[in-house]
């Protein structure tokens, strides 16, 4: 997804990928060794690189490597998503992997701002709601979801209200 300052993004539609864990920092989203790139091209394939390799070494599969979540457009995450250093590479890598919207319990402020600048809507839900969203995405990985920025709701197999601050919301609309 490429967004410009004038792009209207009233909603994001697609399948969702459920990522579990609090305090997932920018170093985990895109390891520091990938920050030397001159352009952001190719960063998507390295999203969560170290987490993915670590799980593969144990015979496990990271959610970003599971076939059923390939092509997902919406990311469901937990608390303090995107904490750590203020690198734009983190939301760039998610965007280039295919993520067009993120719903989490909370976001690191700079990460949130970088996402908004890139045209990636970020919405907040409470712990119980993210639990229900994770469960629904795991139960049916092929389910279609709509993050409705205008109505401040996520709709799919279940529907949950989301919080999007007025300022960022107005940038999308």
Regions flagged by a language model, labelled:
Residues 1-173:
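Fe-S-dependent hydro-lyases/dehydratases of central metabolism
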């Amino acid at each position: 997804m490429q967004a410009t300052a004038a792009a209207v993004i009233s909603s994001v539609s697609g399948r969702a990928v459920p990522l579990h864990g609090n305090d997932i920092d920018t170093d985990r989203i895109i390891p520091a060794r990938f920050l030397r790139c001159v352009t952001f091209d190719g960063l998507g394939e390295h999203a969560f690189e170290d987490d993915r390799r670590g799980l593969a070494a144990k015979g496990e599969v990271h959610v970003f490597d599971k076939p059923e979540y390939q092509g997902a457009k919406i990311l469901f995450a937990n608390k303090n998503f995107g904490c750590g250093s203020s690198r734009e590479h983190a939301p760039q890598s998610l965007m280039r992997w295919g993520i067009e919207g993120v719903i989490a319990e909370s976001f690191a402020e700079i990460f949130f701002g970088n996402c908004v600048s890139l045209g990636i809507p970020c919405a907040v839900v409470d712990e119980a709601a993210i639990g229900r969203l994770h469960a629904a995405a795991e139960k049916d990985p092929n389910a279609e979801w709509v993050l409705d920025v205008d109505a401040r709701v996520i709709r799919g197999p279940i529907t949950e209200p989301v919080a999007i601050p007025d300022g960022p919301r107005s940038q999308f609309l």
